[in-house]
Curated annotation (Swiss-Prot):
The record marks N357 as: Cleavage by asparagine endopeptidase (AEP). The keyword Cytoplasm applies. It holds the Pfam family Aldolase_II. This is Gamma-adducin. The gene is Add3. Residues 683-700 are annotated as: Interaction with calmodulin. Residues 590-605 have a biased composition (Low complexity). InterPro entries: Aldolase-II_Adducin_sf, Aldolase_II/adducin_N, Aldolase_II/adducin_N_sf.
Length: 705
């Protein structure tokens, strides 16, 4: 192949059927002044404008009075429900209020199309005319309308649910005509009296259906114990109401209903004779009323009990319709013995929650636990029912020993600063330290066991080796509290400001970086205890009041004198003992003179003066000057003399001679005619070894001579 053919590039044109993709510039007009202003705007300024728009929407939501009142209601409900340390339920309800969308994982209602109207809309309505407990009752009734819509019980005509809110005044709440069950809210309900006169119109302008309200009013006037009435006529209930046999005892649901009353309903209960007949049919305890060829009515002392009966009636009617159609007639069905099963089944259902009250401390009313579960489902779907739960779904976790009040296990491992990036090499280098820390903080307790070693032959060796084994009873081995630390903030108190925690941590780390001497942490147990310490011995500090320190004897020596003194010490160490012997002989002669002086006490002062002159000459012969330390020079010289002659060793034959020198004052005291000494004896015998620098050197005496 040629070079021209090898360099040729083959391009494929796009298919003609490809649709034209709309671009960004096709949707805008470049001559638009708004577009030109945004285009010429700096990116930072454009971002600031976008943030301002977002904050504006958030500010509008936060400043709305409806949001504020609803938030207060949520907080009050959360406080009544129990202690929830995290507060996730309240935050979830706030998110439901802002977004008003269905939660992920739950199917949206068919009529809501992903958006639902909140049931509890009372914070924005006027509630001054409400009686005690009416807010909660309105929320329950509106929630029950929503449940009837979700279950498919809604009907466009004569299907209503009513609740009596005031037994003294006979005020009844019902939904107005023209408002569907899916639109029912707490504020949209209408409050009327027993004869149908409007007491509170609610948030709508719709009126009630008097023909549909007449059965409710008749039942309330007949049965003072009834608080809620639910009237439905679904396909199953209407079909069973048209059967001569009525509700057959062929299922558990039919046995739960108890006594069932039947009444020939003609469309209204306005006449007095009809109401008297209804009162005879219902009796004092009947909770289910079948209206012939019309539908079913369920009664209850509470709203939860009425829902319990209407739900079981609907299920029993559906089972009966399916059973009759499948069996080919009532004669082919197995009818249960009412005398044998009805009392037991009805009694279990009346205990509340299907018998969950047996052996439990919490007593549930009839149908309350099931209704609370349905309200929780509606709240999860975003309906915001406003229902006051008796018990939250999530049980509070038991307090573990690794909570805040128990301190952490002390280790020497410290975490790196969050602001400083950690290199991979340093991270790998600290791997061993992290493994050690994890082992130290392990909740397992180990004990040291000596295990005999095994030799290569398989025989047991007399030597032992140390092995760490897990202790079965930690209380006998460990005295601490081993805690497995999984989170660095495990012991940080809850509901604290993270900024304050970081500032406190950084402050502690700054103190650790500097070598500060402090008294350490103060014990909380020993803080109030006072310890009586014995008085310590007095010590003089370096101040003006203390006694002066002795001066340095070498401070006045010249360099030459110090060198000669050093050489003298070196000669002595080398074994030059002849000079020492001569100096000792001279010292012995002086000692003999002193002994003669002590034998004649009358001439002691004169002899002392002569000895003083002799000693001064002998001191000058030595190159080391004498430093006088004391008040009186005479007394110091005598002290030096006593120190010199106290311990002299002339030879092996000459013994140590102890000489006591008395001062002139002491001599006068002894020789005083009165015999009473003027001063107390303060000086005692002193025994010192003659310093080496005071000994005479024979060679130096010859040089001086």
């Amino acid at each position: 192949m040629s070079s021209d053919t090898s360099q040729a590039v083959i391009t494929t044109p796009p298919p003609p059927s490809m649709p034209h993709k709309e671009r960004y510039f096709d949707r805008i007009n470049e001559s638009d002044p708004e577009y030109l202003r945004e285009r010429n705007m700096s990116p930072d300024l454009r971002q600031d404008f976008n943030m301002m728009e977002q904050r504006k929407r958030v500010t509008q939501i936060l400043q709305s009075p409806a949001f504020r009142e609803d938030l207060e209601c949520l907080i009050q409900e959360q406080m009544k429900k129990g202690h929830d340390p995290t507060g996730l339920l309240a935050l979830q309800q706030i998110a439901d209020y802002i977004m008003a969308n269905s939660f992920t994982g739950f199917s949206s209602p068919p009529l809501s199309l992903g958006m639902v109207t909140p049931i509890n809309d009372l914070p924005g309505a006027d509630t001054s005319s409400y009686v005690k407990g009416e807010k909660l009752t309105r929320c329950k009734l509106a929630s029950l309308y929503r449940l009837a819509d979700l279950f498919g019980w809604a009907h466009l005509a004569n299907t209503y649910i009513s609740v009596r809110v005031s037994k003294e005044q006979d005020h009844i709440i019902i939904i107005p005509r023209g408002l569907s069950f899916s639109e029912a809210t707490a504020s949209a309900l209408v409050k009327v009296n027993i004869i149908g006169e409007v007491v509170d119109q609610g948030s709508t302008n719709l009126k009630i259906d008097h023909s549909g309200f007449s059965p409710h009013a008749a039942i309330y006037s007949t049965r003072p114990d009834v608080k809620c009435v639910i009237h439905i006529h679904t396909l199953a209930t209407a079909a069973v109401s048209s059967m001569k046999c009525g509700i057959l005892p062929i299922s558990q649901e039919s046995l739960i209903l108890g006594d069932v009353a039947y009444y020939d309903y003609q469309g209204s209960l306005d006449e007095e004779e009809e109401r008297i007949e209804l009162q005879k049919v219902l009796g004092p305890s009947c909770k289910v009323l079948v209206l012939r060829n019309h539908g079913v009515v369920a009664l209850g002392e509470t709203l939860e009990e009425a829902f319990h009966y209407i739900f079981n009636v609907q299920m029993a009617c559906e089972i009966q319709v399916q059973a009759v159609a499948g069996a080919g007639g009532v004669d082919n069905l197995l009818i249960l013995d009412l005398q044998k099963y009805k009392a037991f089944t009805h009694g279990v259902a009346m205990t509340g929650g299907g018998g969950v009250n047996m052996g439990s401390h919490q007593k549930w009313k009839v149908g309350e636990i099931e209704f609370e579960g349905l309200m929780r489902t509606l709240d999860n779907l975003g309906y915001r029912t406003g229902y006051a739960y008796r018990h939250p779904l999530v049980r509070e976790k038991p307090r573990h020993k690794s909570d805040v009040e128990i301190p952490a296990t002390v280790t020497a491992f410290s975490f790196e600063d969050d602001s400083v990036p950690l290199s991979p090499l340093k991270y790998m280098a600290q791997r061993q330290q992290r493994e050690k820390t994890r082992w130290l903080n392990s909740p397992n307790t180990y004990m040291k066991v000596n295990v005999p070693e095994e030799s290569r032959n398989g025989e047991t060796s007399p030597r032992t080796k140390i092995t760490w084994m897990k202790a079965e009873d930690p209380s006998k081995v460990s005295s601490g509290t081993p805690i497995k630390i999984e989170d660095p903030n495990q012991f940080v108190p809850l509901n604290t400001n993270p900024t304050e925690v970081l500032e406190k941590r950084n402050k502690i780390r700054e103190q650790n970086r500097y070598d500060l001497k402090t008294a350490g942490p103060q014990s909380q147990l020993l803080a109030g205890i006072v310890v009586d310490k014995p008085p310590s011995t007095m010590r003089f500090e370096d101040d003006d009041q203390g006694p002066p320190a002795p001066p340095n004897p070498f401070s006045h020596l010249m360099e030459g004198e110090l060198e000669e003194y050093t050489k003298t010490i070196e000669r002595k160490q080398q074994g030059l003992d002849d000079a020492e012997q001569e100096s000792l002989s001279d010292d012995a002669a002086s000692v003999s003179q002193i002994q003669s002086q002590t034998q004649s006490p009358q001439s002691v002062p004169e002899r002392l003066e002569e000895n003083h002159e002799l000693f001064s000459k002998s001191f000058t012969s030595v190159d080391v000057p004498v430093i006088v330390n004391g008040k009186d020079e005479m007394h110091d010289v005598e002290d030096e003399l006593a120190q010199r002659v106290s311990r002299l060793t002339t030879s092996t034959t000459i013994e140590n001679i102890e000489i006591t020198i008395k001062s002139p004052d002491r001599t006068e005291e002894v020789l005083s005619p009165d015999g009473s000494p003027s001063k107390s004896p303060s000086k005692k015998k002193k025994k010192f070894r003659t310093p080496s620098f005071l000994k005479k050197n024979k060679k130096k005496e010859k040089v001086e001579a």
